[in-house]
Amino acid sequence: MSPTKTQNSAEENIRAELGLSAEVVTIRRNAPAALLYEDALKERDTAISNAGALIAYSGDKTGRSPRDKRIVEEETSKDNVWWGPVNKPCSERTWEINRERAADYLRTRDHIYIVDAYAGWDPRYRIKVRVVCARAYHALFMTNMLIRPSKEELENFGEPDFTVWNAGQFPANTHTSGMTSKTTVEINFKQMEMVILGTEYAGEMKKGIFTVMFYLMPVNHNVLTLHSSANQGIQDNDVTLFFGLSGTGKTTLSADPHRLLIGDDEHCWSDHGVFNIEGGCYAKCLGLSAEKEPEIFNAIKFGSVLENIIYDPNTREVDYEDSTITENTRCAYPIEYIPSAKIPCLADHHPKNIVLLTCDASGVLPPVSKLTPDQVMYHFISGYTSKMAGTEQGVTEPEATFSSCFGQPFLSLHPMKYATMLAEKMAEHNANAWLINTGWTGSSYVAGGKRCPLKYTRAILDAIHDGSLAKEEYEVLPIFNLQIPKAVGDKVPASLLNPSKNWAEGEAKYTSNVKSLANLFVENFKTYQDKATEQVLAAGPQL
């Protein structure tokens, strides 16, 4: 079968860009999974699992490198970008050096892969993304994670809106101005390009596109980008957004047999409703089992990519309990591998419920509380949870951690911009907001408290979705001033709902623990208080 005109055009453009000879270099554009498997298996250590997934390894870097992320400081975007520890500036000269370094590396390869696909399921807002890389595993990963074009769309794809140059096998030059290591992940909003050097971790590509959408959607379209999962009721079409950091239950709780999954990680809220940014899921694998998370377990099959896992070399069976390489074992698969996925992944209904998830190891936050609009802004900007032992090197006891908008590493603009947009959209569409603690109750993790059982959290969500929880009688939790329901139907013990009344060491000890956590909130919020209203500041804990 002869290549299409667009196929030739895309390849010719890349050849011209890099100065490649047709005789020396093979370019594969939107190659099928079977072909990418064949190429990937030529790399050392790559294998196929007994379930049919491609097993690949990302080298030394098994997670993102946030300290090495940079935004090019240039005139079109510099007044919008939230500069600081999250978005460190680099000069246009440094960008040019690193982009050319990436191109130089790609010129040395005998195979180059192009993935042309979309970010954003709503055709009104989607962007055309081109990924250029040298590893078949990276090509399959992004084929899964982006929205795959139809044959007709691919033939008429044209020029991309944004291009990722992934030369991650090749290090950055540490003598280049502004380099702090051999890794750099750089985004240029003027050129609409991204360069990766010194890391083969595939998640950098996915989260790079996310950062781009965090910029383009609010700035160009007044569309709110969110680090959230989303689902929709099968009968009532009601949409729920779930915000939460790693380990809070965002993926688990959005997978509901009575609801359709719109997406598990990245979404946008427009004037028309909610749409997923991605065409796939990037699920954590540590501790995965068919019993606990059957939909994810069964999605690991031919076409999926297993990253940095340990397997039995004789049977090719994966050991999901083994974290020898990293705690951050992952699998990337197309979203249609999830039976409950809503395809296309968008809803023309606005969210009825907003759920902020936290895993509070101090045990002082209630299992559920109803939030006022100002409290939503405060807790959304705070983005609190507890970092559990084992999630990062050196963490041996739970630590309080804050990540603004529940996605600080990916934000392009000041957090207050996203929080204000969220509050405006919630007010316009009369959405309810809830803070759900999936962490400890009765006492802290350290003092022997118990984690809130998943069945009770699911019962709370059922009461939110059927509207009964909004009608319950409420009482106020002091200091944090949270509204706590006195009952959640007959599925959740009433004694579980108010931590001040069920604290194992008594109310005085509870109050002491509340004040300790409240102080952490107040200290963290000092970063944002210059742009916060008095009402939002008053919505936080009052000591």
Swiss-Prot record:
Write down the chemical reaction(s) this protein catalyses: oxaloacetate + ATP = phosphoenolpyruvate + ADP + CO2
A GO term for molecular function: phosphoenolpyruvate carboxykinase (ATP) activity
Q: What is its EC number?
A: 4.1.1.49
Enzyme class, first EC level, given as a word: lyase
Pfam family example for this protein? PEPCK_ATP
- InterPro entries this protein is in? PEP_carboxykinase_ATP (IPR001272), PEP_carboxykinase_C (IPR013035), PEP_carboxykinase_N (IPR008210), PEPCK_ATP_CS (IPR015994)
Binding of ATP occurs at: 244-251
Keyword terms of this UniProt record: ATP-binding, Decarboxylase, Gluconeogenesis, Lyase, Nucleotide-binding
Which GO terms of the cellular component aspect does the record hold?
A: cytosol
**Pathway linked to the protein:** Carbohydrate biosynthesis; gluconeogenesis
Asked if the keyword Nucleotide-binding belongs to this entry, the reply reads yes
**Which SUPFAM superfamilies does this UniProt record tie to the protein?**
PEP carboxykinase N-terminal domain, PEP carboxykinase-like
NCBIfam families (UniProt xref): pckA, PRK09344.1-2, PRK09344.1-3
User: HAMAP family this protein is in?
Assistant: PEPCK_ATP
Query: Which family is this protein grouped under?
Result: Belongs to the phosphoenolpyruvate carboxykinase (ATP) family.
**Name listed for the protein in its UniProt record:** Phosphoenolpyruvate carboxykinase (ATP)
Query: Which organism's genome codes for this protein?
Result: Kluyveromyces lactis (strain ATCC 8585 / CBS 2359 / DSM 70799 / NBRC 1267 / NRRL Y-1140 / WM37)
